[in-house]
Amino acid sequence: MKVNLLLQKSLLLFATVLSAHAQEKPVKVFILSGQSNMVGAGKVDGGGTRWGSEIIDPVVSVYGGTYNPKADYDALRPIKTLKLEFFGGTNPTPYPGGGVQVTRGFVQIKESGIYEFRPGYGGSSNCLMEVGGKEVHRQDPGGEAIRAEIKLEGGQKVPFKIIYFTKDANGLGWTARLDVPGSLKTLVKFGGKYPYLMNNKGQWTARDDVYYRGVVTATGSRWMGVQGGRIGPELGFGHSVGEAIDEPVLVLKTSQGNRSLGWDFLPPGSKQYEFEGKIYAGYKESPLSWNKGAEPKPIDWYAGKQYDDCFSAAHEVLDNFDTQFPHWKGRGYEIAGFAWWQGDKDRYNLAHAKKYEENLVHLITTLRSEFKAPNAKFVVATLGQTAKDSDDVNERLILDAQLAVDGTAKKYPGFKGNVGTVYTHPLSQGGASNSHYNGNSQTYMDVGLAMGEAMMKLLKGK
């Protein structure tokens, strides 16, 4: 018994020492960058749409007195009724007032699915709404809205009723489809995927060990979780590395849509070159290209402008680390890795596509040098629509370049064990990079998770 007790105390002390040691270590920073799909276009849900043509024959009835929860308003005689010519939208027909107001009518949804109803705005949200006899919304004055989802068949007319608890009553309201194919809410709530993103109350959760800081686009400063209507790969990436690393993690994303590596993100030190009778700009030169022998006429953009904008913004965050992240004040940080998902725009320009591999190699070495992180790992993700047997010349040039920098390809000995490429074609749920993979959040989550797993393999030397 004494031996077991001594062993338990020793294990507890060891765990405490390990925990304290992890707290003392610098924050692990991962810098994510790229174009629009790194920015993020994965749908979180279907969003709410204002009531409109789906509401049929709305009529408001007014009953004397104030709201009585014990009253059966279907059995009582109203003191007045009004057919509502306009219901929903932004300018519904005003209610007459003068008592308890109850609206009745029908709902006819176009597409079958699972829906949520959000009646009212401000004070008029204090009401009870039933659809098809089921209570779908209740908000008592001073309380929070309690809603229940309901499954509706497209084209079917279903009766609805709204009882307003106060004199604030109007025809404003919204409907949200909860099971939009490919949306994150559908995947989590109805598809059983990524259960760690939502609690048992159906609310999005946030990690307390991974912090998100977005600059340039997809801006934000918060603990990693779902916020807003779109996600990028940072959500899956953050979860993947957060689960594997003891120290706290900062995911610093700096990205911009519709940008090429051969022009907008061209790294410092890149030289101009000739291709098919044209001179293509080197870093800080303008325009993108000009005829050989002609005098270039600069425009209000230059080669590498987006590189400068994105990574100077990242520097600004890191240079003010204690101010930006007071919860980590005095702890310091270490840039552990970079993650890059880009290539769509380069595939529209043969010169850029042919130069992509050289530019990508230069990007990797330049970022490590610029951020004084020579040992930082680097993960590249390919374009989801491009298969290894694709016969599209430009897309294959981009894909082959991205695969070539992987350390296991052995083309660049200096990248062995520190650069990895994620082949995302098997992870794509359809669409293409230029259509943002149809907004399918599974693509964004799975690519992010895979990039995080690839990063951890590099960090662990596997």
Residue ranges and their predicted role:
Residues 54-182:
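Acidic/polar, compositionally biased interaction segments
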Residues 4, 17-19, 31:
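A composition/secondary-structure signal for short, hydrophobic, low-basic-content segments
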Residues 23-72, 177-462:
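Cell-envelope and extracellular/periplasmic
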Residues 7, 18, 379:
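Conserved Rossmann-like nucleotide-binding pocket used by diverse enzymes
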